[in-house]
Protein backbone atom coordinates (compact mmCIF):
# COMPACT_ATOMS: atom_id res chain seq x y z
CA UNK A 1 0.00 0.00 0.00
CA UNK A 2 2.75 2.47 0.86
CA UNK A 3 4.27 2.25 -2.63
CA UNK A 4 0.92 2.20 -4.42
CA UNK A 5 -0.30 5.25 -2.54
CA UNK A 6 2.67 7.26 -3.77
CA UNK A 7 1.59 6.49 -7.34
CA UNK A 8 -2.04 7.35 -6.58
CA UNK A 9 -1.03 10.77 -5.26
CA UNK A 10 1.38 11.35 -8.15
CA UNK A 11 -0.81 10.34 -11.09
CA UNK A 12 -4.36 11.76 -11.26
CA UNK A 13 -5.55 9.03 -13.62
CA UNK A 14 -5.14 6.39 -10.88
CA UNK A 15 -8.42 6.42 -8.97
CA UNK A 16 -7.42 4.34 -5.95
CA UNK A 17 -6.16 1.04 -4.62
CA UNK A 18 -7.71 -2.20 -3.41
CA UNK A 19 -6.77 -3.83 -0.11
CA UNK A 20 -7.60 -7.44 0.75
CA UNK A 21 -9.21 -7.23 3.09
CA UNK A 22 -10.86 -4.73 5.43
CA UNK A 23 -12.96 -7.10 7.56
CA UNK A 24 -11.84 -10.64 8.23
CA UNK A 25 -14.18 -13.41 7.14
CA UNK A 26 -14.97 -17.09 7.55
CA UNK A 27 -13.56 -19.27 4.80
CA UNK A 28 -10.24 -19.46 2.97
CA UNK A 29 -9.06 -20.40 6.44
CA UNK A 30 -5.59 -19.23 7.34
CA UNK A 31 -4.54 -17.61 4.07
CA UNK A 32 -3.07 -14.74 6.11
CA UNK A 33 -1.29 -16.89 8.65
CA UNK A 34 2.35 -16.58 9.65
CA UNK A 35 3.67 -20.12 9.83
CA UNK A 36 6.25 -20.83 12.51
CA UNK A 37 6.02 -24.61 12.14
CA UNK A 38 6.25 -25.68 8.49
CA UNK A 39 9.04 -23.42 7.33
CA UNK A 40 10.00 -25.58 4.34
CA UNK A 41 6.55 -25.58 2.77
CA UNK A 42 3.56 -23.28 2.75
CA UNK A 43 0.09 -24.47 1.78
CA UNK A 44 -2.63 -22.03 0.72
CA UNK A 45 -5.00 -22.98 3.53
CA UNK A 46 -4.37 -23.79 7.17
CA UNK A 47 -5.77 -26.79 9.06
CA UNK A 48 -8.17 -26.67 12.01
CA UNK A 49 -8.45 -24.78 14.36
CA UNK A 50 -8.16 -22.02 11.73
CA UNK A 51 -11.63 -20.84 10.69
CA UNK A 52 -11.12 -17.27 9.52
CA UNK A 53 -8.94 -16.08 6.66
CA UNK A 54 -6.89 -14.02 9.15
CA UNK A 55 -6.03 -11.30 6.67
CA UNK A 56 -8.39 -8.50 7.68
CA UNK A 57 -7.64 -5.03 8.97
CA UNK A 58 -10.42 -5.81 11.44
CA UNK A 59 -11.01 -9.17 13.07
CA UNK A 60 -14.28 -11.09 12.96
CA UNK A 61 -15.90 -9.03 15.72
CA UNK A 62 -14.83 -5.70 14.27
CA UNK A 63 -11.84 -4.88 16.46
CA UNK A 64 -9.10 -3.13 14.54
CA UNK A 65 -5.76 -4.87 14.10
CA UNK A 66 -2.56 -2.78 14.18
CA UNK A 67 -2.10 -2.88 10.40
CA UNK A 68 -5.28 -0.81 10.01
CA UNK A 69 -3.62 2.12 11.79
CA UNK A 70 -0.65 1.91 9.43
CA UNK A 71 -3.03 2.23 6.47
CA UNK A 72 -4.86 5.10 8.16
CA UNK A 73 -1.57 6.97 8.54
CA UNK A 74 -0.65 6.39 4.88
CA UNK A 75 -4.02 7.78 3.79
CA UNK A 76 -3.39 10.94 5.81
CA UNK A 77 -6.31 10.27 8.15
CA UNK A 78 -4.30 9.86 11.37
CA UNK A 79 -1.71 12.19 12.88
CA UNK A 80 -1.02 10.31 16.11
CA UNK A 81 1.59 7.52 16.05
CA UNK A 82 0.66 3.96 16.95
CA UNK A 83 2.64 1.38 18.95
CA UNK A 84 2.34 -2.42 18.82
CA UNK A 85 4.57 -5.37 19.70
CA UNK A 86 5.33 -8.71 18.10
CA UNK A 87 4.87 -11.79 20.31
CA UNK A 88 8.27 -12.44 21.95
CA UNK A 89 7.60 -16.20 21.98
CA UNK A 90 8.43 -16.28 18.25
CA UNK A 91 11.19 -13.66 18.19
CA UNK A 92 13.94 -15.94 16.91
CA UNK A 93 11.78 -18.51 15.14
CA UNK A 94 12.08 -18.96 11.37
CA UNK A 95 8.75 -18.44 9.64
CA UNK A 96 6.91 -18.28 6.34
CA UNK A 97 4.38 -15.69 5.21
CA UNK A 98 1.79 -15.79 2.45
CA UNK A 99 0.88 -12.99 0.03
CA UNK A 100 -1.94 -12.07 2.44
CA UNK A 101 0.01 -12.25 5.70
CA UNK A 102 0.06 -9.11 7.81
CA UNK A 103 2.21 -8.39 10.84
CA UNK A 104 1.43 -10.52 13.88
CA UNK A 105 2.05 -7.53 16.16
CA UNK A 106 -0.67 -6.74 18.70
CA UNK A 107 -1.36 -3.72 20.85
CA UNK A 108 -0.28 -5.32 24.09
CA UNK A 109 2.52 -5.09 26.61
CA UNK A 110 1.37 -8.13 28.58
CA UNK A 111 3.83 -10.96 28.02
CA UNK A 112 3.93 -12.82 31.31
CA UNK A 113 6.71 -15.38 31.39
CA UNK A 114 8.73 -13.52 28.73
CA UNK A 115 10.53 -11.13 31.07
CA UNK A 116 14.08 -10.53 29.88
CA UNK A 117 13.43 -11.94 26.42
CA UNK A 118 14.00 -9.99 23.19
CA UNK A 119 10.95 -8.38 21.61
CA UNK A 120 10.27 -6.35 18.47
CA UNK A 121 8.23 -3.16 18.78
CA UNK A 122 6.59 -1.58 15.74
CA UNK A 123 5.93 2.17 15.59
CA UNK A 124 3.70 3.56 12.83
CA UNK A 125 3.92 7.28 12.12
CA UNK A 126 4.05 9.95 9.45
CA UNK A 127 7.24 11.53 10.76
CA UNK A 128 11.00 11.60 10.21
CA UNK A 129 12.19 9.83 13.35
CA UNK A 130 10.91 7.80 16.26
CA UNK A 131 12.39 7.26 19.71
CA UNK A 132 11.38 4.32 21.87
CA UNK A 133 11.26 4.36 25.66
CA UNK A 134 10.77 1.37 27.95
CA UNK A 135 9.81 2.41 31.47
CA UNK A 136 11.15 5.89 30.82
CA UNK A 137 14.55 4.79 29.49
CA UNK A 138 15.45 5.54 25.88
CA UNK A 139 16.11 2.42 23.83
CA UNK A 140 16.98 4.02 20.50
CA UNK A 141 16.13 6.88 18.17
CA UNK A 142 16.00 6.06 14.48
CA UNK A 143 14.63 7.09 11.12
CA UNK A 144 11.14 5.96 10.17
CA UNK A 145 10.81 4.02 6.94
CA UNK A 146 14.23 2.36 6.77
CA UNK A 147 12.67 -1.08 6.15
CA UNK A 148 9.07 -0.18 5.32
CA UNK A 149 7.56 3.26 4.87
CA UNK A 150 5.80 4.81 7.85
CA UNK A 151 7.18 2.11 10.18
CA UNK A 152 10.12 2.00 12.59
CA UNK A 153 11.14 -1.36 14.05
CA UNK A 154 12.85 -1.46 17.44
CA UNK A 155 14.59 -4.35 19.16
CA UNK A 156 14.48 -4.30 22.94
CA UNK A 157 14.02 -6.55 25.96
CA UNK A 158 10.60 -7.13 27.44
CA UNK A 159 9.97 -5.89 30.94
CA UNK A 160 6.54 -5.12 32.42
CA UNK A 161 5.55 -1.48 32.70
CA UNK A 162 5.10 0.76 29.70
CA UNK A 163 6.58 1.22 26.25
CA UNK A 164 6.26 4.65 24.66
CA UNK A 165 7.17 6.04 21.26
CA UNK A 166 7.87 9.71 20.57
CA UNK A 167 8.02 10.82 16.94
CA UNK A 168 9.73 13.86 15.43
CA UNK A 169 9.65 15.90 12.24
CA UNK A 170 12.56 18.27 11.60
CA UNK A 171 13.74 17.51 15.12
CA UNK A 172 10.50 18.68 16.75
CA UNK A 173 8.19 16.30 18.58
CA UNK A 174 4.92 15.78 16.70
CA UNK A 175 3.27 13.01 18.71
CA UNK A 176 3.58 10.12 21.10
CA UNK A 177 1.80 6.88 21.94
CA UNK A 178 2.24 4.15 24.54
CA UNK A 179 0.96 0.80 25.72
CA UNK A 180 0.95 -0.29 29.36
CA UNK A 181 1.09 -3.63 31.15
CA UNK A 182 -2.23 -4.41 32.82
CA UNK A 183 -2.08 -4.78 36.59
CA UNK A 184 -3.06 -7.97 38.40
CA UNK A 185 -6.45 -6.66 39.52
CA UNK A 186 -8.18 -8.26 36.55
CA UNK A 187 -11.75 -7.23 35.86
CA UNK A 188 -14.20 -8.63 33.34
CA UNK A 189 -16.19 -5.95 31.55
CA UNK A 190 -19.02 -6.19 29.04
CA UNK A 191 -19.72 -3.55 26.40
CA UNK A 192 -23.03 -3.59 24.52
CA UNK A 193 -23.45 -1.89 21.16
CA UNK A 194 -26.82 -0.44 22.20
CA UNK A 195 -28.60 0.74 25.31
CA UNK A 196 -31.63 -1.55 25.13
CA UNK A 197 -33.41 -4.03 22.88
CA UNK A 198 -37.07 -5.09 22.71
CA UNK A 199 -37.98 -8.14 24.79
CA UNK A 200 -38.86 -10.16 21.71
CA UNK A 201 -37.20 -11.77 18.69
CA UNK A 202 -37.10 -8.64 16.54
CA UNK A 203 -33.71 -7.23 17.54
CA UNK A 204 -30.23 -8.27 18.58
CA UNK A 205 -27.45 -6.82 20.70
CA UNK A 206 -23.75 -7.49 20.37
CA UNK A 207 -21.90 -7.61 23.67
CA UNK A 208 -18.10 -7.51 23.72
CA UNK A 209 -16.47 -9.05 26.79
CA UNK A 210 -12.96 -7.96 27.76
CA UNK A 211 -10.49 -8.62 30.56
CA UNK A 212 -8.48 -5.72 31.90
CA UNK A 213 -7.49 -3.71 34.94
CA UNK A 214 -9.21 -0.79 36.64
CA UNK A 215 -7.49 1.68 34.29
CA UNK A 216 -8.86 0.00 31.19
CA UNK A 217 -5.62 -1.69 30.14
CA UNK A 218 -6.52 -4.93 28.41
CA UNK A 219 -4.96 -8.10 29.72
PLM regions: where:
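Short, solvent-exposed loop/turn segments enriched in Ser/Thr/Gly
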Residues: 201-207
Amino acid sequence: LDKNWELIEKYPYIIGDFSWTAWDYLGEAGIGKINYEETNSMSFYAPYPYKAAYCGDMNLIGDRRPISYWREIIWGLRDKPYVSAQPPQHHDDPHNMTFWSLTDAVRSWNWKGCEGKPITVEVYADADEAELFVNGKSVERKKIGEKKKFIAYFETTYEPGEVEAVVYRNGVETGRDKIVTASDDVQIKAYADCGCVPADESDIAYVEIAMGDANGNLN
